[in-house]
């Protein structure tokens, strides 16, 4: 069992009725062994239920905890946010999984770009690059001010932090591809790391292409076992089929088929809606009677 040490709500999206939560969870072995870019899979039931992959957003090996950040986009994440609080135990927590981010000393800057919930998995990559002395320029963005989080954490680990919102409600009105282009134009950038919604990463790749800067994207697909057996997380990368859970989650952005990935991620939307549905047959009729 893994005890929840801290629970915080980071943001709430009124338009979509979705929240972002931060959980600090006791997990000594994972905290000792994890590296930037790796993820865990959790379940809220011992034997049944959906398995949710989440990149580790932070960790402390000495204190034995990891931090996970998730958005309440479906039935399982909603149940997790409502039913699990500080002092409770997460029944199943497996990790660290996936290949870690390749961190090395660069001649130029490392440009790290996070959008929406993608800000959370970007955080340890920013930290790791900062720790070895790379110049880190970080861009974080969201649709509106209320959906931003980790600003202070990112500023602490970055040489420069650029914050943008789609509607201009906080800091600069822009989408993340605009500062991407500006930074690449003004100085030497050795690598770009982009994490966020698939459509955002697709446009970041398109914006980076004219500059010829290597770009790494971290993919968050549907997963079940996390070992490559089920094939649910397969994506097209170059001319090959890759499994996000074992080959990733990070891939060369220029080679990822984002259109195919986005299509596959809609495969279970109908089932997700059914999971949230509450049958009221007979109940409403009884009220009318």
Write out the residue ranges for each language-model feature.
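A generic structural signal for residues embedded in beta-strands
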Residues: 42, 92-93, 235
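Local cysteine-cluster metal-coordination motifs and their immediate loop/turn environment
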Residues: 121, 198, 220-250, 278-283
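Short Fe-S-cluster ligation motifs
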Residues: 243-247, 251-289
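Short, surface-exposed secondary-structure boundary micro-motifs
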Residues: 45, 95-96, 238
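Short, Lys/Arg- and Gly-enriched loop/turn segments at beta-strand edges
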Residues: 48-57, 97-105, 245
């Amino acid at each position: 069992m893994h005890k929840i040490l801290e629970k915080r709500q980071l943001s709430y999206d009124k338009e979509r009725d979705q929240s972002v939560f931060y959980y600090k969870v006791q997990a000594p072995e994972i905290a000792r062994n994890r590296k930037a870019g790796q993820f865990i899979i959790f379940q809220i039931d011992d034997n049944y239920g959906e398995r949710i992959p989440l990149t580790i957003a932070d960790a402390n090996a000495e204190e034995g905890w990891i931090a996970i950040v998730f958005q309440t986009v479906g039935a399982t994440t909603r149940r997790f946010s409502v039913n699990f609080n500080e002092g409770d135990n997460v029944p199943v927590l497996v990790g660290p999984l996936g290949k870690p981010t390749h961190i090395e000393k660069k001649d130029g800057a490392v440009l790290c770009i996070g959008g929406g919930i993608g800000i959370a998995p970007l955080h340890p990559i920013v930290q790791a690059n900062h720790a070895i002395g790379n110049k880190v320029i970080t861009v974080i963005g969201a649709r509106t001010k209320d959906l931003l989080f980790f600003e202070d954490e990112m500023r602490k680990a970055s040489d420069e932090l650029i914050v943008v919102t789609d509607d201009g409600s906080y800091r600069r009105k822009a989408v993340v591809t605009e500062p991407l282009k500006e930074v690449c134009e003004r100085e030497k950038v050795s690598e770009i790391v982009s994490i966020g919604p698939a459509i955002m990463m697709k446009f970041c790749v398109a914006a980076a292409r004219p500059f010829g800067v290597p770009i790494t994207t971290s993919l968050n697909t549907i997963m079940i076992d996390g070992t490559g057996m089920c094939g649910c997380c397969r994506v097209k990368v170059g001319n090959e089929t890759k499994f996000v859970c074992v080959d990733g989650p990070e891939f060369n952005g220029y080679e990822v088929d984002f259109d195919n990935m986005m299509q596959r991620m809609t495969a279970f939307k109908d089932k997700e809606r059914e999971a949230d549905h509450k049958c009221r047959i007979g109940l409403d009729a009884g009220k009318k009677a």
